[in-house]
């Protein structure tokens, strides 16, 4: 079982990655938007009674930081690819930009697709044109993600589940990797 997990969040600017992290780690919602260049934090979580140190790496969605973003990918155990349900470009960019960047840097790391700002479906100027869950699940299948989740950092809906799923996904991936090592035959001798 992993004692520490590195979780990296990627996606376009202003899709709610930082708000999601702040809500999860401090149970507050940031009132003002502040673009992220690069930030990381950590929390201790428990899974099946075992304490795990969860490292959370918030990346810049802005293309101006494309060259330094891969530094945060090193040794990641799970990636959360985030888009806003109220921003079609952020949704399209998961397939057209983010998945290729992740796969070129982390070819074997599990990815979860996370729809953020789901409160916008109920209130807000974009509610009629918001991306629905069916479209999100289809995208997750198209990019071969391990799962699809929805959340709203503003209303604190689904936030806990996102990180529970991230931890469980990383742990399961590590177990599969260890099982393969255990059962792989490197050398065969006949006596």
UniProtKB/Swiss-Prot annotation:
The modification Cysteine methyl ester is found at residue 188. GTP binds at residues 11-18, 58-62, 116-119. Interacts with GDI1 and GDI2. Interacts with ZAP70 (via SH2 domains) and the interaction is enhanced by its phosphorylation by LCK. Interacts with SYK and the interaction is enhanced by its phosphorylation by FYN. Phosphorylated on tyrosine by LCK. Phosphorylated by FYN. Phosphorylation enhances the interactions with ZAP70 and SYK and is critical for its function in thymocyte development. It comes from Mus musculus. This is Rho-related GTP-binding protein RhoH. Expression is widespread in hematopoietic cells, including in bone marrow progenitor cells and in differentiated myeloid as well as lymphoid cells. Expressed at high levels in the thymus and mast cells, found in spleen and low-density bone marrow (LDBM) cells and is detected at a low level in neutrophils. In the thymus it is detected in thymocytes of the thymic cortex but not in non-lymphoid cells of fibrovascular and fibroadipose tissues. Expressed in T-cells, B-cells and mast cells. It comes from the Eukaryota. Keywords: Cell membrane, Cytoplasm, GTP-binding, Lipoprotein, Membrane, Methylation, Nucleotide-binding, Phosphoprotein, Prenylation. The region involved in interaction with ZAP70 is a non-canonical immunoreceptor tyrosine-based activation motif (ITAM). GO terms for cellular component: cytoplasm; immunological synapse; plasma membrane. GO terms for molecular function: GTP binding; GTPase activity; kinase inhibitor activity. A motif (Effector region) lies at residues 33-41.
């Amino acid at each position: 079982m992993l004692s520490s997990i590195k979780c990296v969040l990627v996606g376009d600017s202003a899709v709610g990655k930082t708000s999601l992290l702040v809500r999860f780690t401090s149970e507050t919602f940031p009132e003002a938007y502040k673009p992220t260049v690069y930030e990381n934090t950590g929390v201790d979580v428990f899974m099946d009674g075992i304490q795990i140190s969860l490292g959370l790496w918030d990346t810049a969605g802005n293309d101006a930081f494309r060259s330094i973003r891969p530094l945060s990918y090193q040794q990641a155990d799970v990636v959360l690819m985030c888009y806003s349900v109220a921003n079609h470009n952020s949704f399209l960019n998961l397939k057209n930009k983010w998945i290729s960047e992740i796969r070129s840097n982390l070819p074997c790391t599990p990815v979860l697709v996370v729809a953020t700002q789901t409160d916008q479906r109920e209130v807000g100027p974009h509610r009629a044109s918001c991306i629905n869950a069916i479209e999100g699940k289809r995208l997750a299948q198209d990019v071969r993600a391990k799962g699809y989740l929805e959340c709203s950092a503003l209303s604190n809906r689904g936030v806990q589940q996102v990180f529970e799923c991230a931890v469980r996904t990383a742990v399961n991936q590590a177990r599969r990797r260890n099982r393969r090592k255990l059962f792989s035959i490197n050398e065969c001798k006949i006596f």
